[in-house]
Amino acid sequence: MENCITPIFISIVQAIVEEFAISLDTVFLDGSKFEANSNKYKFVWKPTTFHLRLSEKALNLLRLMHLSDDVPKDGIISSKLLTEKLTESQKIDPELIEGGETALKKMRSQLYEYLIKSVEYEEKEAICGPDRNSYYKTDHDATAMCLKEDYYSGLGSQMHAAYNTQIVVCRGIIVFYYLSQDRSDTRTLIPTLEGFKSMYGCYPKRICADAGYGSFANYKYCNTKGIEAFIKYPSWNGERTGRYPAVYEYLEDGTVSCLGGRTGNRVEIPNRHPKTQQSAFYKVENCTNCQFMAYCRRFMKEKEGNERIFEVMPEYVTLKQGARDRLLRPEGIEMRVNRSCQVEGTFGVLKQNMAYTRFRRRKLAKVRLEFALTCLGLNIRKFLKFKISGTPAVVKHFRIKFSFSLAKQDLFA
């Protein structure tokens, strides 16, 4: 069933697209978290900090046993290395250890306990993987996330076992779905669009998404693939309402213009290193009488000064300003309104109308299958609602068309 669901989904979507003459050039992306079918109290945090502390204790113990020559001084000591050191400890002369045979036995026993604990930590870290920091005992693929509907406290601050779902919507039809274990939407845009490309053979020409996707990597990816990105950035709402305007603007001549209208040029600061390789420092002078000084320096320790240093990523700022210009165009305004209606409305139908807020199955593969069937059912439901008005002939036409599409792909051969 898992191998067949993707071709079936493609066939039905293509049938609907042909029936309505829908173009997949413009799509809308959004994500939402669905609660997992897991015991909400049986969660495990990734024990990286405890593992580092354990490695420090093991290193100190190995130094007392004169076995720390080839042991890394920083980082985590693997259980394999601890096993080798435990074997080597059997050959240590008790006279070399302060306390003799009794102290050596205690050290061996302590090293064995460290080994058992290290194996436990490594197992938990392997389950979490490199991109997660938690899992649940009854569903190892579920991740602890904060949900908007928090029935614990009602504040949305308590952790729940959940999966992060992404849907790509075009004219109310879910044309692609993606299931993720990420707690945020930022890192899901690229795999979602790559999946869209593998399913339909091309990227969409325009995509609209909210500020959760407005990162440098996503802007750069869309620019590289030739996708016109109508994607907000995190500070969009503050800038548009005027409550938190941008403190500088990056100009085409390679300089910056601050909120007070002063120009800043690029400078090199010997005793200060940029946060990233793409960053550069820009210096704005004569700030003494600036009316925006309090706002501009609100996060700085020195609230007054005659100059201000900005750390700028020119490429990211250029892409972000380009996204802002697109969002402010009439086309961008229409896209933003459509996104709120289409993709958020689709999640509203799923969660509110269909009362589908929690997965019934466990494990990532089974949950992905369940979500695919749910999206498939929603697409068929929308087709029947908008296209079919009680005429059996139309239903028969769609059934024949879909059956021919399945036979053409030879799914069950």
Show which residues each predicted segment covers.
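Anion-binding and metal-coordination hotspots
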Residues: M1-A413
